Amino acid sequence: MTSNRKNENEIINAVSNHSAQMDLLPDARIEDSLCIAEGNNIDPFVSASTVQTGINIAGRILGVLGVPFAGQLASFYSFLVGELWPRGRDQWEIFLEHVEQLINQQITENARNTALARLQGLGDSFRAYQQSLEDWLENRDDARTRSVLYTQYIALELDFLNAMPLFAIRNQEVPLLMVYAQAANLHLLLLRDASLFGSEFGLTSQEIQRYYERQVERTRDYSDYCVEWYNTGLNSLRGTNAASWVRYNQFRRDLTLGVLDLVALFPSYDTRTYPINTSAQLTREVYTDAIGATGVNMASMNWYNNNAPSFSAIEAAAIRSPHLLDFLEQLTIFSASSRWSNTRHMTYWRGHTIQSRPIGGGLNTSTHGATNTSINPVTLRFASRDVYRTESYAGVLLWGIYLEPIHGVPTVRFNFTNPQNISDRGTANYSQPYESPGLQLKDSETELPPETTERPNYESYSHRLSHIGIILQSRVNVPVYSWTHRSADRTNTIGPNRITQIPMVKASELPQGTTVVRGPGFTGGDILRRTNTGGFGPIRVTVNGPLTQRYRIGFRYASTVDFDFFVSRGGTTVNNFRFLRTMNSGDELKYGNFVRRAFTTPFTFTQIQDIIRTSIQGLSGNGEVYIDKIEIIPVTATFEAEYDLERAQEAVNALFTNTNPRRLKTDVTDYHIDQVSNLVACLSDEFCLDEKRELLEKVKYAKRLSDERNLLQDPNFTSINKQPDFISTNEQSNFTSIHEQSEHGWWGSENITIQEGNDVFKENYVTLPGTFNECYPTYLYQKIGESELKAYTRYQLRGYIEDSQDLEIYLIRYNAKHETLDVPGTESLWPLSVESPIGRCGEPNRCAPHFEWNPDLDCSCRDGEKCAHHSHHFSLDIDVGCTDLHENLGVWVVFKIKTQEGHARLGNLEFIEEKPLLGEALSRVKRAEKKWRDKREKLQLETKRVYTEAKEAVDALFVDSQYDRLQADTNIGMIHAADKLVHRIREAYLSELPVIPGVNAEIFEELEGHIITAISLYDARNVVKNGDFNNGLTCWNVKGHVDVQQSHHRSDLVIPEWEAEVSQAVRVCPGCGYILRVTAYKEGYGEGCVTIHEIENNTDELKFKNREEEEVYPTDTGTCNDYTAHQGTAGCADACNSRNAGYEDAYEVDTTASVNYKPTYEEETYTDVRRDNHCEYDRGYVNYPPVPAGYVTKELEYFPETDTVWIEIGETEGKFIVDSVELLLMEE
């Protein structure tokens, strides 16, 4: 340091005539009093070596954090060995003596000798390890050097484990503390080497993991130990007077430099958290000794004995309360003057004002001491400059041997440099007149030396002046300088190739609700705290690199509550997530209560000078959130690849149970496996091809396990409504066994679409649109067969919904379990900065960056209640009692939408075994099963009776059991009456979805098939097509204005005008007899006429008038045996034969009909064992309504002579309403 100082200007002129030693005075007694004390005094031995070593090591470590280059590490270890085990006096002994003198406590001789001997052994071993490491780094392929290094590493690490307790001897913890901290630092650096080089010099992956876990554990333990005993030693020095404060402040400063600064860097040794070069910053402040005369035999000549203020008063005046980091910009010094004689007088520093500014913040001004003096103040400006050294002169003005002297500072030299412009350097001076026996030079570099003597101190300085306090009493005027470490830069510069740690106290301003609190000792400075929602203050950063570089955000926090943490850049939110509490309210802030978290979503800066803001929301209660620092982490290709690989490995391993790596966890969903497979597929082939292949095999195995346990058929939706080849068909009723169908795939409405995977689904998914009529819902269903189920077991249906509205989900066995789900869509998973999530061939680019969102939030809905799910995952469980393969009750899985606004996109459906039923759940399912069986027995008795009545009525319609010829007297009313009895059979179909057959479906379809046959035969016997006008005016010729209207659930022809006419040409069998039967109603005056005729003559007519009595038509009719049932069905037969459609067409709507057609035979509401469902049997001729009052049925016999007759309908006046027209062939 001496050589460096020669490069600076000489001592300022104001004190050039005065020696740093005191001049002799004529009075011998005064001369004696001014002698420097050589015996026991309060001024402890300040070892430049002790402080220098602590500063040097911390400064050097700051340059090799993260993963250093091999050359850097070898040089660093060589430096450490040279600093801690130098030639000459033992540095460890100097550490011991320095702390002993600070606390005035001698360590026992045995403890001293044991510690020093063990440290000497560690030094020898460490030096040997360091030399072997250098040899190996020069030739890593040499097997011998690798083997030697492996052996020495294991032995040296074990030596440290055994040695550390010797530096923590009971009742000797404080004097040994600096030794303990330095030894702990070496141990942690050694443990880091296992992660850096262990795999190369022979450590197995298990050994590396064990050493890493030990490093994490020891980092916590060493940190808490050092902080605890630092506080213990400091508190033991707390006194009541100024003398105790001097010792207290020296301990605080020197052990901050030698202990706490190291502790603050311990976490950054973690190469898994910091895998690249890392920039750390120390923002704590240290205070050099007060600028007052000390070490003089005469008590009053020492400033702290000259009626100085109390301990607490000095602490309040000199030590700053917690605050944001700021930088000194201007100092204005106010002076006072005292005079004893022309040869004894002094003008000295009496007070000052300071202007300082946080990074990018506003100017703050504070006043200290007395400023109401008559002497012109001296203003010194330091904007953008670091004051790296002060040379202050402590003056003592003697008033006589029996009077108290005045202590003051007449001269200070402030040495400054501009860190951004090294040529901008110099001195700023405060110099006032002084005449007295002598001055004491107080050089700040004695207490805060540069980091190295190999460069000028304006380049190698370790600290910068940040603030100045002053201890003021009537005869005491001594400033106290506050210093910050130079690692805390002025610009928050972010590099593209390093992790930049930025303490939160470097914010530009402090928002309301945020407070700065004293750091816990292991953070390297103060921290920020909030107890409510709000921001922590903006941090202005300077980006040193391309703006295309991507970064992530990490941060270190402690909290007594859960909270949402938001990060924004330039006003745009780039990250947010919910984080959990780390401690309980009232807990002490210890190392383990702070955790480091990092976001995975990268972002870019938009300008070189940018702003990062952090805030918290959604606190789970009253509590405290502490933030230590944030980290700006560059996303490099290698770093991203390694991070992605680690994340993929963790995700794949998490698929399987801990006890059996070949067994899939129950709570791992099929959707989750697909997302993990995406994660693996996106790994870089360039960086981790082998690992990628291995992980892909594991995730494929997991997918196979998922498929094996899934009881659903075709869960990937390869097809819907695909009929298996082996399914049998009931020829009699033309009814395919839906029970058999449903156990072999999906069945659904025609409007469902299967779509290929997108950015949400990896595999096929289905889209269910809305419907215009709740009686014709959109539906999808499948049956889990009884043979797939286990008795007394709970099963779970689950899947993933991209979005939905009014989606109803049912699980049906003994009863229906039901939920209605509204799941809001994700809009887009892709941020605006991503151009397109589509690959080159149009496929989804699942590797593109996307917003993070939490799909695992739960939503609880009561059974049957409609709710908005926040989770896109859904699950519904059902309990199975005893199983019966003959009954084959199974479980129906149903998805349904019955609203126009409804919709759903869903996939990855699973039906899996969850767990056996025990306890109350077992009792509950047995009760449900018994209740269901009791109802089933009652239903069977009822069904037997209803079925007998219905079958008798149906059989009466036909000639025999062949069901191919109707009885001669069978008419449409009899058919309708029989059909009504058939529909009294309950549980033919499920009320939840009437296309699914119920327990009585088979007998219902048997009889319903006969009804359909009867109607078909009856239609064939009636040669008039669309005679009931159910298909509007199809097959009829119309002249004038006519209409078909719905009345009493029937379709009626309405002729409102006399000039209108409706007619139809009908093919007949010449020579056979026919009956023309018409049911109609006449309103108003005039007559309604239905005429039948041939081309010439042979005309007959039925006339209708208002208020006529209904005629009873005869049942005995003639026959024409040679006329086939198929004759006369050509032409428009298909369009008119509306009643021949089976139930399977019930959900198809004919959009080509000429009128707004609604089927005539409406279904009445019917109470099922579950609930009413007015849509349940809306499929055919059910409850055919009787002819309303006022309608009249008339008929006549007609014998055509040709093969064509014409039927014409008209009126003379008023309105003529025709319900039906029939021309029936007479039978024998």
Curated annotation (Swiss-Prot):
Keywords: Sporulation, Toxin, Virulence. The keyword Transcription does not apply. GO terms for molecular function: signaling receptor binding; toxin activity. InterPro entries: Cry1Ac-like_dom-VII (IPR048645), Cry_V (IPR041587), Galactose-bd-like_sf (IPR008979), Pest_crys (IPR038979), Pest_crys_Cry1Aa_dom-IV (IPR054544), Pest_crys_dom-III (IPR005638), Pest_crys_dom_I (IPR005639), Pest_crys_N_sf (IPR036716). It comes from the Bacteria. One of its GO terms (biological process) is symbiont-mediated killing of host cell. Residues 423-434 have a biased composition (Polar residues). Belongs to the delta endotoxin family. Promotes colloidosmotic lysis by binding to the midgut epithelial cells of insects. Toxic segment of the protein is located in the N-terminus. This is Pesticidal crystal protein Cry1Ba. It comes from Bacillus thuringiensis subsp. kurstaki. The gene is cry1Ba.
